[in-house]
């Protein structure tokens, strides 16, 4: 983050000097002007010499939404470093390397249980907490895992509040619900706080290039992506409860996203 802020500060300073005539206009400055003119995050054009995109996280947002996103990310990191205490729920989407945080959950659990790290993976459980502010103040970290928030779902939705049928306690967290069909005109609704738990890999699970497939009828393995571009922005597999055949969600392309496009 500090590197990105430094790059932005210097490029804007150079732009100011260039417009004032105290610095020669370089191609990088011209590319910066071109991006700002069309409200594009500078450097997203592959031919641009402006370095903002190079030091940023994957995103499809336009200039103002991504700038606001950057301020929010900086706020989380600043708060975290000031207290040196892990938040009760981490905004996973706000990390430059979300997979590193998920791996740390596995590492802590492996160390605590004496298990081999490569014999562990993660599973997810949707809580009944609408957002991080809904987590009770006296809550502790869930068993062998952590809370994350800020995810969205595409191709389905997850129930909130009274829609959640028969919530129950699991690992020190209140969880419940299952995948439901999307509402009309609701393209990417948010999901509740997610409980990510480190678990031992079971012999019946099938290893694949994207994670372990459980082959359980009531669990849909939903890919989690950083952006709606999917593909190279893949992070991990989330395990979501379903009461209908899970191939329904495969056909609808149901997946979790870490950020919306706007």
Question: Which positions does each model-derived feature cover?
Answer:
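Long C-terminal appendages of very large multidomain proteins
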Residues: 1-262
